[in-house]
From Swiss-Prot:
Highest taxon in the source lineage: Bacteria
Classification via Gene3D superfamilies: Divalent-metal-dependent TIM barrel enzymes
Pfam families tied to this protein: AP_endonuc_2
The protein's name: Uncharacterized protein SCO3347
Family membership noted in the UniProt record: To M.leprae ML2432 and M.tuberculosis Rv0498.
Length: 285
């Protein structure tokens, strides 16, 4: 049993709401909901909503709702191929500039699509070069193979399993881990001290990327959060769940309130701190 003097609550781990979590509602609605429910901040998914692409509009929302922007998700999705540019490096440069201007500590990046051949060839070295030019973390996110019936397609390069390549920081997405049928805790072990950002959502291993509310699938969401608390994780935990099936605004908010309560409960477990905690590497391995 831990002594009172050993008890620790992770004060620096902020819980943010991804603006994608309110889709099909707007980016502005995400700020409003995050403030009302008591989130620590937001992660802005840059996509087809014009407000998500407008730094000054985002700054006004952040100021009005007193909701810090903790991370910017670069426009890496199929539906955002023309957002900010058709050049993937320009997208990342603009995401970095947005993060710097808005005070966000992290830019979330997906690995390239396989058909982006030159971008994929240059990606690992290019991410290192960009990371060397800023204090903003470029946290590369684990993805998954695309599946249809019994067929599997490798859609990402160098690999959907980002731990196979050398990045300074990683994002772990638990829904993506479920879709790829990967052992999440093993992946976190491979990321080690380079884990810089967490997308918290649940999944059941479906071929579809489910993004369920934590606790509604088979991912070790609680164990992951407790491990983060135990190791002194210094990044952010972002709720990135799918609420498209919500029948009303009240139902959507109830799901997002449940996700926040789950996350804070398991980050606040009483543990014995690990001396020193994890350190973030800044050199290549």
């Amino acid at each position: 049993m831990a002594k009172p003097s050993d008890a620790v609550r992770i004060q620096d781990t902020k819980v943010a709401l991804s603006t994608a979590s309110v889709y099909p509602e707007s980016t502005a609605t995400a700020f409003e909901i995050a403030a009302r429910l008591g989130y620590d901040g937001v992660e802005v998914m840059v996509w087809t909503d014009p407000v998500s692409q407008d730094i000054e509009a985002l700054r006004r929302l952040s100021d009005y709702h007193r909701m810090p922007i903790l991370a910017v998700h670069a426009p890496c999705l199929l539906i955002t191929q023309r957002v900010w540019s058709t050049d993937p490096w320009v997208k990342l440069q603009r995401a970095r500039a947005a993060a710097e201007k808005l005070g966000a500590s992290t830019v979330v990046v997906h690995p390239p699509f396989r058909w982006q051949r030159q971008y994929a060839r240059d990606f690992v070295d290019g991410i290192w070069r960009m990371a060397d030019e800023t204090d903003v973390r470029f946290a590369v996110e684990n993805m998954y193979p695309w599946r249809y019936r019994d067929r599997e397609m490798q859609a990402y390069a160098p690999d959907w399993d980002v731990t196979k390549d050398d990045y300074r920081h990683f994002t772990i997405d638990l829904s993506h881990a479920a879709t790829s049928r990967t052992d999440t805790l093993d992946m976190i072990d491979r990321m080690s001290d380079r884990l810089g950002h967490v997308h918290l959502a649940d999944g059941k291993g479906s071929a579809k990327d489910e993004h369920l509310v934590p606790g509604r699938g088979n991912q070790p969401c609680a164990e992951v959060l407790e491990r983060l608390a135990h190791t002194g994780f210094d990044g952010h935990v972002v709720i990135e769940v799918n609420t498209r099936r919500a029948m009303s605004g009240a139902e959507r908010e109830a799901d997002l309130a449940e996700a926040l309560a789950f996350t804070r409960l398991h980050l606040a477990q009483t543990v014995s701190p690990v001396p020193g905690g994890p350190a973030t590497r800044t050199d290549r391995r």
